[in-house]
Swiss-Prot record:
Keywords: Antibiotic, Antimicrobial, Cleavage on pair of basic residues, Disulfide bond, Immunity, Innate immunity, Secreted, Signal. The keyword Electron transport does not apply. Residues 150-162 are annotated as: Active core. Proteolytically cleaved by proteinase PRTN3 into antibacterial peptide LL-37. Proteolytically cleaved by cathepsin CTSG and neutrophil elastase ELANE. Residues 1-30 form the signal peptide. One of its GO terms (molecular function) is lipopolysaccharide binding. The keyword Iron-sulfur does not apply. The gene is CAMP. Belongs to the cathelicidin family. This is Cathelicidin antimicrobial peptide.
């Protein structure tokens, strides 16, 4: 009879331990941020540390690179932010702020950790000069096309003058 008395108690403890075993991994998974959430948290940190007058808001998030499954390993990120009309001292979220017309655009690169408990990032943002790079590419290509065109014109002038000189028949 003693065995039967402890039997149901042991069964209940087994059930409790089984349920705890199922719940614990869910709690761990809940602490992992998505790629975009990690970037937005990093952006909050950037806004807090910024000496600029206004908040920055995410303008463009580059596609997520292929990553390993370890949330504690730093993940590479790259994104573009733009200055908003909201002052840094506001209590508003940057996502609730409109972009400032002709606001400063910055290109940010670095790493984030997806583990919410660690909440770590290493991001640097610089003024976005990609527009100027595209403009430079435009002028370089235009120069090449003009150069080829002038070379063709020069060849035609040379051919024209060559045809004007009377040829002597031998």
């Amino acid at each position: 009879m003693k065995t039967q008395r402890h039997g149901p108690s042991l069964g209940r403890w087994s059930l409790v331990l089984l349920l705890l075993g199922l719940v614990m991994p869910l709690a761990i998974v809940a602490q992992v941020l998505s790629y975009q959430e990690a970037v937005l948290r990093a952006l909050d940190g950037i806004n807090q540390r910024s000496s600029d007058a206004n908040l920055y808001r995410l303008l463009d998030l580059d596609p997520r690179p292929t990553m390993d499954g370890d949330p504690d390993t730093p993940k590479p990120v790259s994104f573009t932010v733009k200055e908003t009309v909201c002052p840094r001292t506001t209590q508003k979220s940057p996502q609730d702020c409109d972009f400032k017309e002709d606001g400063l655009v910055k290109r940010c690169v670095g790493t984030v950790i997806l583990n919410q408990a660690r909440d770590s990032f290493d991001i640097s943002c610089d003024k976005d000069n990609r527009r100027f790079a595209r403009l430079g590419n435009f002028f370089r290509k235009a120069k090449e096309k003009i150069g080829r065109g002038l070379k063709k014109i020069g060849q035609k002038i040379k051919d024209f003058w060559g045809n004007l000189v009377p040829r002597t028949e031998s």
